[in-house]
Amino acid sequence: MAKQAIKKGVGIKKTGLHSFKEKHGLIPENNGSYTSVSNADKPIDWILMPKAFVSATRLPGIPLNTVCSVIGHSNVGKSTLINHAIAAAQRQGYIPVIIDTENSFSFQYAQSMGFKCEPIYGDVEVESVDPETGDVTITTENQIIYWDGAFLYYNNKILCDKFGNWDYNQGKQVSKKRNVAVVEDVAMCINTLLDAQDNGEIDQGFLFVWDSVGSIGCYKEYNAKGIGNPQWTAAAISAAFNRIANDRIPSSKKISSKYNNTFLYVNKVWMDAMTNPVGPAIMQTKGGKSLKYATRLEILMGGQLTSGVKRLTATYKGSDYSYGIETKIKILKNHLDAPHNVCYEGKMIASDVGFVDPEDLDDYKKNHISNILKKLQEITNTDKIITVDDIEFKEIEETD
């Protein structure tokens, strides 16, 4: 049987891919105002960090429009890092949103790194008990009752006040408010502020800082009346932060987005000996791995097995004043574009005024010797005037 000749393309209208994109609105109009169909990214920009950070990491700072994390043991410089970040963000015109579920944020310490905040004073009734008679005396003192400035601050109490009437199982508000903050409240807080930005109520970009992931449980744990399960919180974080970490924050890097929004969260580490019973323990973070997967830059402060820091002390007749720590800093994960996709490690000194390059330690001691002597004078409570010749500087190393 003879084969029938078939002419290719007969009856089919030829259209290029460009024409298809134009027809379906997949190409932005070149009128200077690009719509959501634009797939181009803004040039990478940064929340600029101090010299010590740049020298140690080879990065200018915290990348805008990303999810970033700083992890590590206690007392390794994590708070110093986030304080530098919020101060820099404020200077650069962004609104720092401090979500303090550890209830440990110090406005005074942040001020020493350039954070602008103003104390508001008010009269507060203070009770004092006489240790001999047991009599209670109530006096009125003028104390700081509020810190004001170009920032937003939420602790557990404020989160409960604003979002404590949410029943996250039913997805609706109820009449009774919780007095315990949960991880879903943190996500609700971030989404509420991003909604306000979308609606034009706030005309600035945000730096969201959450300290820290493992400090509170989830709504299911709250309903279980204290019976906890780490998997519950991990699942709650995965569900509550999915859109934030994978859409709302990273989408702000597109040129179609008017604002730059960044999310920096703090997480503590723990050593998992069960996963690898015949080998060394594995460093893990709290709250599961969903946020970890969405993180573009992961920064480890200190060591892995221990804090791995050096305590920098000034000593006078057996009394020590710790004026800083020398801490390690390592980029564990970097999914930034070249040439910034580098993973260096180095050292920094965390002091009362922020990070100091180890090369500048002698200059730091020289410039702050009066404060060091003052602190030693207070600790020793001596009538003798302590001078620099009376003290000894030590470095006490905690091995990794």
Model regions: which residues?
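Short, hydrophobic/amphipathic alpha-helical packing segments
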Residues: 83, 183-191, 238-246
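Detector for small/aliphatic-rich hydrophobic stretches
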Residues: 1-75, 80-99, 167, 400
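Conserved catalytic network of the ASCE P-loop NTPase/AAA+ motor domain
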Residues: 60-63, 88-92, 193-203, 248-259, ...
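Conserved inter-motif catalytic segment of the P-loop NTP-binding fold
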Residues: 92-230
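C-terminal regions of RecA-like/P-loop NTPase motor modules
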Residues: 1-40, 306-400
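Short His-Asn-centered micro-motif
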Residues: 71-73, 99-102, 266-268, 301
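Phosphate-binding/switch region of NTP-binding enzymes
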Residues: 231-351
